[in-house]
Amino acid sequence: MGQKIHPIGFRLGVQRIWTAKWYGSNRNFSDTLLEDIKVRDYLKKKLSHASVSKVLIERPAKNARITIFSGRPGVVIGKKGEDIEVLRGELARLMSVPVHVNIEEVRKPETDAQIVADGIAQQLEKRVMFRRAMKRAMQNAMRLGAQGIKIMSSGRLNGAEIARTEWYREGRVPLHTLRAEIDYGFAEAKTTYGIIGIKVWVYKGDALTRGEQPAAAEQEKRGKKSGVKHAAAS
């Protein structure tokens, strides 16, 4: 089950939060949801080179607050904040309410699944070999603290006549474990041969409950205890 289901949807309410926070009545729920989809599509096209990880949409009392998580916040803000003002105006027109835009920096974009997937897609569109792009992304993620990463590419890889799927994994990626912090990203590369889909899973460690110790510390503690017993016996 963990292999097939969407890793973020699987963990919603357990250790992940929703990326849309608002309440809609039965009468206007569908219109508000459609607005959200249009806003996300617009931001995806507009900020395609700004390494956007996710977009959080909140709707407090007749206005909207949009938080953009980006690996390159300077690209979003623009020179002297000009670009963000234009962006705010466009979003206000789309949503028909006053919009406040916040920019949050992603500290380690190399370990963010969505940014990694977008980066690989951009490389494939520039005719970089898919294996090289995947392996380079995996090395960067592991070097910067990811405990495991899995990347899957599907489509006419290297222009092959028959579409196929190839994937690589480094480290652990426990998709069944609910407490495991799994980040997931998906992107499409529009190549001359057709569309290639890229999926990325990044394992960042376990979400610990209060008073619980990480697995490594627990093993070390057990080792010390067994060492004391051994010394006492000798």
From Swiss-Prot:
Residues covered by the KH type-2 domain: 39-107
Q: Which PROSITE patterns does UniProt cross-reference here? A: KH_TYPE_2, RIBOSOMAL_S3
InterPro entries, sorted: KH_dom, KH_dom-like_a/b, KH_dom_type_2, KH_sf_prok-type, Ribosomal_S3_C_sf, Ribosomal_uS3_bac-typ, Ribosomal_uS3_C, Ribosomal_uS3_CS
Give the Pfam families listed for this entry.
KH_2, Ribosomal_S3_C
> Which Gene Ontology cellular component annotation is one that this UniProt entry carries?
cytosolic small ribosomal subunit
Record has rRNA-binding as a keyword: yes
UniProt entry keywords in alphabetical sequence: Ribonucleoprotein, Ribosomal protein, RNA-binding, rRNA-binding
Q: Which GO terms describe its biological process?
A: translation
Q: Where is this region: Disordered?
A: 212-234
For molecular function, the Gene Ontology terms on record are: mRNA binding; rRNA binding; structural constituent of ribosome
Question: Subunit structure of this entry?
Answer: Part of the 30S ribosomal subunit. Forms a tight complex with proteins S10 and S14.
Q: What function does the entry list? A: Binds the lower part of the 30S subunit head. Binds mRNA in the 70S ribosome, positioning it for translation.
Q: Which NCBIfam families match?
A: rpsC_bact
- Which HAMAP family does the protein's record reference? Ribosomal_uS3_B
User: Which family is this protein grouped under?
Assistant: Belongs to the universal ribosomal protein uS3 family.
Name of the protein this chain belongs to: Small ribosomal subunit protein uS3
Q: Supply the source organism for this entry.
A: Thiobacillus denitrificans (strain ATCC 25259 / T1)
